[in-house]
Amino acid sequence: MTFRMSDLSDLARKRVAVAAYYFVPGLVFASWASRIPDVKHLLHLNNGQLGSILLAIPLGQLLMMGFSGVLVSKLGSKKMLVVAEVFYAAVLLAMGCSSTVFHLTLSLVGFGMMANLMNIATNTQACLVEKLYGCNIMSSFHGLWSLGGFAGGIVGAVFANTVLPIEAHFGTVLALSLLILAAGFHFLVNDEQARAEEEDVPKFSFRTIDPVLFLLGLMGFAGMFCEGTVYDWSGVYFTSVVKPDEVFIRAGYVAGMGAMTLGRFLADGFVTRYGAARVLKVCGLLILCGLLLATLLPYLVTATLGFLLVGFGISSSVPICYSIAGKLGTVKASIAITIVSSISFFGFLVGPPVIGWLAEVSGLRMAISIAACLGLMIAFVATKVSKRISIDTDSRANAF
């Protein structure tokens, strides 16, 4: 098959556009996260009140779970992606302007709802671009979310050290987000082509659902459980167990997040070369070895190295599962991604609390070491489904 330069250029534009739509939510979410301490101070919240209010985000995601896949399937991922991301950024400003707990909670629920719709729409768009490319590029898209998160953290730190109010910070992020979204909108993949390709795809039914989707969701659940553990407990683990000098308290978190970002940009090449199943097995084993290293040898160097390995392990497990789900062809890509992402999300939701409950009973070292079993589960499930998913990941085409 002969490729024209114009075709390659058009594909490149689509990829950059979808990448931008991954970058923006990372920027927006990190902007919010960076100002949580300031919001807590302004509304005079204690830790318990703040924790309860933050549950509004997963509540919003749960409320939207039953509708996101249907909306994306019926109205198209392009339209829903733009709607979700515009409102996601707009709600950020509403959160910054909230003067009462009620208004903040209501805004956070909307933030969570838009996050869920956006998650389905962005990953559906990514699957469409991946099909056009004919090679594995899903993980690199998720890497752009991580880069957006780093950018949001830096912007947040800059604004936090000025006299400007939170509204000015979030308003600036909103304006920048709208500019990026407007620039990329024209180049997003049109859903008409996807609908034409999916005409022969069977209609969704719980009675005939592909069990592989549940297994992909199970691996995603395990990966996001461990990701939530790194987000919420790595700092606590270093503070209470490793006990390094104060300057190194965040070493585990930084190592894990840095490895996760780098791993997402490297993963596509490994998937193309070795196949998704093998990469998933390695991801599971990295999580297992990393958490065991951090808990069996709770010293600064070994614990940091352990969380570094965990970061590489969790970097690709969820993006790969989404990519496979979108390629199976047993149901529409948007529905398949909804199923896998919904199961996966529960891992992120229940992971940190479960670690906390286990820590109360057996100590934090034991609790985190138990989470290592989920890495083993990823490797085991990947082995079981390897024959089924290998046909979707044997492309050897080169990405731009």
Q: What residues fall within each predicted segment?
A:
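Short amphipathic helix-loop junctions that connect adjacent transmembrane helices
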Residues: S34-G48, D232-F248
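Interfacial helix-cap and linker-helix signal at transmembrane-aqueous boundaries
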Residues: V39-K40, L71-V72, V158-V163, F238-T239, ...
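Helix-breaking motifs and short loop linkers at transmembrane-helix boundaries and internal kinks
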Residues: H44, G76, C97-F102, G275, ...
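Conserved MFS/SLC helix-loop-helix module at the cytosolic interface between two early adjacent transmembrane helices
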Residues: L63-F102
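Helix-to-loop junctions at the C-terminal end of transmembrane segments
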Residues: M64-S77, A160, G263-A276, A359-E360
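Structural signature of the two symmetry-related core transmembrane helices
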Residues: K79-L93, R278-L293
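Helix-loop-helix hairpin linking two adjacent transmembrane segments in secondary transporters
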Residues: H103, S140-V189
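Cytoplasmic helix-loop-helix junction between adjacent transmembrane helices
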Residues: L108-L144
